[in-house]
Amino acid sequence: MRITLNELLDLDYEGVARSIEEFIKGYVESSGAKGVVVGLSGGVDSTTTLYLLVRALGPERVLVLVMPDSDVTPEEDVHDAVGIAERLGVRYKLIDIKPIVASYLVAMGEAPDRRSKGNLRARVRMTLLYLYANMEGLLVAGTGDRSELLIGYFTKYGDGAVDFLPIGCLYKSQVRRLALHLGVPEKIALKPSSPRLWPGQLAEDELGMKYEEIDLILYALFDKGLSPEEAAKATGLPIEKVRRVLELHRASEHKRSLPPAPDPAATVWRFRRRKG
């Protein structure tokens, strides 16, 4: 068996788009929400998600929050995000989260490490999304893709805290193809991925491999059901990379699960006092 990237990418993308749009419409309608709010970074995932939301619900039911940290976010990303929001005719708000993040540091009286501060930025954005969702009766649409979800490349209770994930069924490389099909500008569709949690952060540099490799490995492991050794042979990728992806998946299981609690039957009810 030989698995190539083309096996993942050879899709009817209009069919994929329509199927996701039906999912969006059905979920929003069943919730009773007035519409959705979504964070727009100017990257491929959030932009593709926004295009699908607008196609499914219409621009009048979509609120966009552009939430840069002016210490970290490149001006180009802000320009791209605002340009897309205006192009699609959606209502948007531009909120610099720098002073909000700074207020945490002042209250703490100490400086956290880079990763902790970066995750704080993601969690500040989450609180703003849910603030507007509460005020306006909206659902929070997530922008994570399947690659990120399976390897845990998101902030717990940050960008991972959402009501639903329209592109959570698509690998990153598939999202890029869908973006081009939907008419997302090429500069955004092909822009290197980055959570923008600290200056100069790039996803592939941090992960140590390209998303095309990650997607092939995930497809081999989770869609084809291959063992790590079989996946390495089928994809032609080093077994070390396969094991790295599998370890990322296992180590991030807590991000994809509800917090555990003791079993009431074993922990509570068996200690019921007997009368008489």
From Swiss-Prot:
E.C. code: 6.3.1.5
Disulfide bonds: none
SUPFAM superfamilies: Adenine nucleotide alpha hydrolases-like (SSF52402)
Binding site for deamido-NAD(+): R123, K156, D163, H254, K255
Substrates-to-products reaction catalysed: deamido-NAD(+) + NH4(+) + ATP = AMP + diphosphate + NAD(+) + H(+)
A GO term for molecular function: NAD+ synthase activity
Chain sites annotated for binding Mg(2+): D45, E148
Binding site for ATP: G39, L40, S41, G42, G43, V44, D45, S46, T143, K172, S194
Recorded metabolic or biological pathway in which this protein acts: Cofactor biosynthesis; NAD(+) biosynthesis; NAD(+) from deamido-NAD(+) (ammonia route): step 1/1
Gene Ontology CC entries for this record: cytoplasm
Pfam families in the cross-refs: NAD_synthase (PF02540)
UniProt key word Ligase: yes
GO biological process terms held by the UniProt record: NAD biosynthetic process
Keywords associated with the record: ATP-binding, Ligase, Magnesium, Metal-binding, NAD, Nucleotide-binding
Assembly information from the UniProt record: Homodimer.
Purpose: Catalyzes the ATP-dependent amidation of deamido-NAD to form NAD. Uses ammonia as a nitrogen source.
Family: Belongs to the NAD synthetase family.
Identification of the protein by name: NH(3)-dependent NAD(+) synthetase
Source organism per UniProt: Hyperthermus butylicus (strain DSM 5456 / JCM 9403 / PLM1-5)
